[in-house]
Design a protein with these regions (language model features):
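Long, highly charged, low-complexity internal segments
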Residues: 1-38, 73-74, 107-200
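A general alpha-helix detector
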Residues: 17-21, 44-45, 95
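Short strand-loop junctions, especially beta-strand C-caps/beta-turns
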Residues: 21, 49-51, 99-101
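Extended, well-ordered alpha-helical scaffold/bundle regions in very large, multi-domain proteins
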Residues: 28-90
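Generic preference for hydrophobic/aromatic residues in regular secondary structure cores
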Residues: 46-48, 83, 93-97, 149-150, ...
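Conserved nucleotide-binding/hydrolysis micro-motifs of P-loop NTPases
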Residues: 52-56, 102-103, 155-156
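Acidic, turn-prone loop/beta-hairpin segments
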Residues: 82-105, 110
Length: 200
């Protein structure tokens, strides 16, 4: 059973979302994230890292579009403006983004390189096309058994922004519901690779 679906990219980073994502993806503490971001800012690699704005300048949006079109093709590009919902947000500052969008990597220690890459990918993804998915339920029957297994998740039809960046979540349940499944067809035979017993 399949239903068409789509997934939009997350906005570029604010201070708090950068801290959360760096913790989930890189294992950084809040203080570590801010110390590394401070270095990146001082070296001219990123915009100011203390902001609660998700806005990008028109210059940044144009630069992101150029990188996306040149590396992935026009179908992956979808320039967009994000609105900052926080009252009294520091609109004077942009979201946290690379100073130069076309700069894929930087010199520096491993932490600096990892955080820069995270910021760049999130920024580019925010300016990319939605992912087109099919919400899918797969029912697996076992020969000679009356019980069936069921897998619920999503199959990617067009990867869009997911080609560059996938957001993490703290809640495992949210992750499970959005699990990506391989494209299969009715009647396909599956090979057993692992059986794992879990208590619920």
């Amino acid at each position: 059973e399949t239903k068409p679906s789509s997934r939009k990219p997350a906005p570029p980073f604010t201070t708090s979302t950068l801290q959360q994502e760096a913790s989930r993806k890189l294992g950084f503490s809040v203080s570590q994230t801010m110390a590394v971001a401070q270095k990146l800012y001082e070296q001219g690699h990123i915009t100011y890292m203390r902001t609660d704005s998700v806005n990008l300048s028109q210059l940044a949006i144009g630069a992101a579009k150029a990188v996306i079109c040149n590396t992935l093709g026009e179908k992956y590009s979808k320039p967009r403006n994000f609105a900052t919902k926080t009252k009294g947000a520091q609109e004077a500052h942009e979201a946290i983004r690379p100073t130069y969008m076309d700069k894929e990597s930087i010199s520096g220690d491993k932490n600096e390189q990892q955080l820069y890459s995270l910021i760049r990918k999130r920024t580019l993804a925010s300016q990319m096309a939605e992912a087109e998915l099919e919400k899918t339920t797969i029912t697996i029957a076992i020969t000679g058994e009356k019980h069936t297994f069921e897998a619920v998740g999503e199959v990617i039809i067009f990867d869009g922004f997911l080609k560059v960046y996938m957001e993490s979540f703290d809640d495992e349940k949210e992750d499970d519901e959005a699990a990506l499944l391989p494209a299969i067809h009715k009647g396909d035979q599956l090979q057993r690779s692992l059986i794992q017993a879990l208590s619920i």
